[in-house]
A protein has these predicted regions:
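Claisen-condensing/thiolase-fold acyl-transfer catalytic domains that form or cleave C-C bonds
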Residues: 1-126
Length: 126
């Protein structure tokens, strides 16, 4: 045993999808599902990480979900931090957990848009 303790706990996660023609909005139904599963609202979430490779995707998701411009991606996102194929989830979690510790945040929402209209969302707690 290494006596390691988790930095965060996964409260819930969900996937969802939209018509592939609107693939950038894939995280929207996933976020709605994960909020419903936890009984939380976006107002209960302290850190929101919308990882998108293109600004139009993030803006579309923010508009659909009613997220103010100043809330998500406090450290940047896929656009500024990099969008390596196959590494997005790991990059988000490491960056996000570290940021949650620095800011003493207790809740975080992570989303990913996946090609073809799919999206994922996860809420974590410290």
């Amino acid at each position: 045993s290494l006596s390691l303790e988790p930095i965060v706990k996964i409260k819930a996660f969900a996937s969802g999808g939209v018509d592939p023609a609107y693939m950038g909005l894939g995280p929207v139904p996933a976020v709605r599902k994960v909020l419903k599963a936890t009984g939380m609202s976006l107002g209960d979430i302290q850190m929101i990480e919308l990882n998108e490779a293109f600004a139009a995707q993030a803006i579309g998701c923010m508009r659909e979900l009613g997220i103010d411009n100043d809330r998500p991606n406090e450290l940047g996102s896929g656009i500024s931090l990099g969008h390596p194929i196959g590494c997005t989830g790991a990059r988000q979690m490491v960056t996000g957990m570290s940021h949650m510790q620095r800011k003493d945040y207790s809740t975080g929402l992570f989303t990913m848009c996946i090609g073809g209209g799919m999206g994922m969302a996860m809420i974590v707690e410290r």
